[in-house]
Curated annotation (Swiss-Prot):
Region spans: Aspartate: 197-200
NCBIfam families: aspS_bact, PRK00476.1
Keywords associated with the record: Aminoacyl-tRNA synthetase, ATP-binding, Cytoplasm, Ligase, Nucleotide-binding, Protein biosynthesis
Source species: Shewanella halifaxensis (strain HAW-EB4)
Functional description taken from the UniProt entry: Catalyzes the attachment of L-aspartate to tRNA(Asp) in a two-step reaction: L-aspartate is first activated by ATP to form Asp-AMP and then transferred to the acceptor end of tRNA(Asp).
Residues annotated to bind ATP: R219, D220, E221, Q228, E483, G535, L536, D537, R538
Recorded name of the encoding gene: aspS
Class of enzymatic activity (EC top level): ligase
A cellular component annotation (GO) from this entry: cytoplasm
Protein name listed in UniProt: Aspartate--tRNA ligase
Length: 598
């Protein structure tokens, strides 16, 4: 039905007759000539209908937005004065010779113009229309190019594309599972996989030493801009490769993606330990475009007569750190109060500040509500430590170390945006040497990555003797403050795996019930293996500049995990529920809960 895509027509086709199909993006009658912008997934081209061809001109005059049409016409160069540099096809237009309306369109329920606003609900309800918009179509096409490039790279490096089960067993991976009731085994449930983690490890045990899969994963968790209940991973696992080798190979893949699709050279990725990232940036996924760093000053303020500072400064688990913001002294008291309110979101109790109004005036040039507690020597030491200059602002975080890191790390990002401090377009890095475990609120331990991550250079006995000191052989790839992917060397020894389960409070009986198949498989010559999983949606979001992964997925869910297009989730047929042995219990209303409480 067509000879070319609309967006592919260019000056090399001048003088040729072409056949195109697509949708009417816009139609207008200017001085008795109909100008039609025809759109398909590859772009838009202008078609001109002249009254000298009255039959086809009359049909063209009836066209409205989103009519689906076929046109035949002659490609001609536009006059220099009419060239549109903003369009890929802007040097040419098509003189329409024939026109067939393939289908008309009802009045549109959403605005198709990129400058017109539609609500998220409208866009998702009429997603098939939303996806016609060039901005959205470009992202979906780009996504396809990324997955194609990933497959070419991995296929070319000896990786095998192997599918793993979607109906599987629930395992503790940090989020709630989506459960699927079994009709055959009444009262029992499958779980949709949060990742193919255990199956890809089993593939390594099976001898398939280089595996990959572009795979759907499912997590029933609270959503935000970069989370969806179902999402796509680029899943990779290898045998007989060290963590450095896995990082090198996957870095090569990502650098190749950016070079091929964006013409961007990311350069070699620096490595940073988890401890350094938290100390300098308050985050294990630092945005290195932001030049601000957390500066420790506990040694300077530990003797001051101000409990807010000297308390954390003398607490082994406390921290006092500052941010020095160039030009920040111009902030009003109201704006500073907004910053103070902002850090409370992350557990901080408040925010002390110091303005350097005039460095040459000594203490008289300093303004701060806590200045009365600080000696001249302390102020001088703070200025030297931070390198603050006239017009700068120093912000203080003083609390438990984890609260200071989280609150000041978040404030660092906000200040970087507010003061337009970001430098460079792309700043990748590897974060390595993560703690293997971290404390839970009840004093227990949980795995920072997952329970199958191997420690660095420890025996099972050493690990159980001092688990909180263990460093995992894990690594995260970070770009512009977003975690692109994470991975680790896996445990390939059954004694080590059992030790980790015990540390996590999983006794031998529970371990056998949940992971017996894995523990059994580890007994039969399991090779050393390591891997990594990338969030495909997040990679596409970053590469296209989208604000949410919903804008790079064809049919995403809302932030409440619903689909306005299909009205999913929905109620099940009672007959189906009976076959499954499932009954629905209606949730109690707030009124009944109140009465019960009384």
């Amino acid at each position: 039905m067509r000879s070319h895509y609309c967006g592919d027509v260019n000056k090399s086709h001048v003088g040729q007759e072409v056949t195109l199909v697509g949708w009417v993006n816009r139609s207008r009658d200017l001085g008795g000539v109909v100008f039609l912008d025809l759109r398909d997934r590859e772009g838009i081209v202008q078609v001109v209908y002249d009254p000298d061809l009255p039959e086809v001109f009359d049909v063209a005059s009836t066209l409205r937005s989103e009519f689906c049409v076929q046109i035949k016409g002659l490609v001609r160069a536009r006059p220099d004065s009419q060239i549109n540099a903003d369009m890929r096809t802007g040097e040419v237009e098509i003189l329409g010779l024939e026109l067939t309306i393939l289908n008309s369109s009802a009045p549109l329920p959403i605005n198709m113009d990129k400058n017109q606003h539609n609500t998220e609900e409208q866009r998702l309800k009429y997603r098939y229309l939303d996806l016609r918009r060039p901005e959205m179509a470009d992202r979906i096409v780009f996504r396809s190019k990324v997955t194609s490039a990933v497959r070419r790279f991995l296929d070319g490096n000896g990786f095998l594309d192997i599918e793993t089960p979607i109906l599987t067993k629930a395992t503790p991976e940090g989020a709630r599972d989506y459960l699927v009731p079994s009709r055959t085994y009444k009262g029992q449930f499958f779980a949709l996989p949060q990742s193919p983690q255990l199956f890809k490890q089993l593939l390594m045990m099976s001898g398939f030493d280089r595996y990959y899969q572009i795979v759907k994963c499912f997590r029933d968790e609270d959503l935000r801009a970069d989370r969806q209940p179902e999402f796509t991973q680029i899943d990779i696992e290898t045998s007989f490769m060290s963590s450095d080798q896995v990082m090198a190979k996957t870095e090569e893949m990502v650098r190749g993606l950016f070079q091929e699709l964006l013409n961007v050279d990311l350069g070699e990725f620096p490595k940073m330990t988890f401890e350094e990232a938290m100390r300098r940036f308050g985050s294990d996924k630092p945005d290195l475009r932001n030049p601000l760093e957390l500066i420790d000053v506990a040694d300077i303020v530990k003797e001051v007569e101000f409990a807010v500072f000297n308390g954390p400064a003398n607490d082994p688990e406390g921290r006092v750190a500052v941010l020095s913001i160039p030009g920040g002294a111009k902030l009003s008291r109201k704006q500073l109060d907004e910053y103070a309110k902002y850090v409370t979101i992350y557990g901080a109790k408040g925010l002390a500040w110091m303005k350097v109004n005039d460095l040459d005036k000594g203490m008289e040039g300093i303004q701060s509500p806590v200045l009365k507690f600080l000696s001249e020597d302390v102020v001088k030491a703070l200025l030297e430590r931070t390198g603050a200059q006239t017009g700068d602002l120093i912000l203080f975080g003083a609390d438990k170390a984890n609260i200071v890191a989280e609150s000041m790390g978040a404030l660092r990002l906000k200040a970087g945006e507010d003061f337009d401090l970001l430098q460079g377009e792309w700043k990748p890095l590897w974060v390595v040497d993560f703690p293997m475990f971290e404390r839970t609120s009840d004093g227990g331990l949980h795995a920072m990555h997952h329970p199958f991550t191997a420690p660095s250079n420890m025996t099972p006995e050493e690990l159980e003797a001092n688990p909180i000191a263990a460093i995992s052989d894990a690594y995260d790839m970070v770009l512009n403050g977003c975690e692109l992917g994470g991975g680790s060397v896996r445990i390939h020894d059954s004694k080590m795996q059992s030790a980790v389960f015990r540390i996590l409070g999983i006794n031998d009986e529970e371990a056998t019930e949940k992971f017996g198949f894995l523990l059994e498989a580890l007994r039969y010559g399991t090779p050393p293996h390591a891997g990594l999983a990338f969030g495909l949606d997040r990679i596409i979001m970053l590469m296209t500049g989208a604000s949410s992964i919903r804008d790079v997925m064809a049919f995403p869910k809302t932030t409440t995990a619903a689909c306005p297009l299909t009205n999913a989730p929905g109620f099940a047929n009672p007959v189906q529920l009976a076959e499954l042995g499932v009954s629905v219990v209606e949730a109690e209303t707030k009124d009944s809960e109140t009465k019960d409480a009384e």
